[in-house]
């Protein structure tokens, strides 16, 4: 496929970006050809995690070492990621969907619209109930927003109801969901959004 759909996955360090990709790819790779690009500052740790998980052959996963601000590599100067896309397509010209995981960054990080067609931004409950209230372009402008690790809410004193209300204030009608990726809670909602809104399944 000459022009695969590209979905960016952004969010702070430890929010669950790599785990989200692992879970989603495990489901979707049964029915379509997928590639993954990971961004890390000085290592290829996330690439190794995905390779070791076995969700895709190693040749379908490329790790990019950004060597600086991870935000720059997905927006102002995305040349390394464009090169990785080209390399993936040289290896597998049938790829229909590419996930591009950003390095862990702040709430302001967004993807260049030239690099990705859609973006998902993920945070986790342990970062605090106030995070959705802070806004941030990553959360506000992403096509889909995820609040992960709902199981931790009682331990950090976070109200999921309040987080939902604050999210609606900043995102309006843009979709979001809660997840506990450890148990796959909420994963169906993420898959449904990808299939319906990015792959346009069920539309005719």
UniProtKB/Swiss-Prot annotation:
Superkingdom of the organism of origin: Bacteria
Gene Ontology terms describing biological process: urea catabolic process
Location within or outside the cell: Cytoplasm
Entry GO MF terms: GTP binding; GTPase activity; nickel cation binding
Any matching Pfam family: cobW
Positions with a binding annotation for GTP: 11-18
Keyword RNA-binding annotated: no
One GO cellular component term noted in the UniProt record for this chain: cytoplasm
Keyword Nucleotide-binding attached: yes
Function: Facilitates the functional incorporation of the urease nickel metallocenter. This process requires GTP hydrolysis, probably effectuated by UreG.
Similarity comment text for this entry: Belongs to the SIMIBI class G3E GTPase family. UreG subfamily.
Identification of the protein by name: Urease accessory protein UreG
Species assigned in the record: Staphylococcus aureus (strain MSSA476)
Gene from which this protein is expressed: ureG
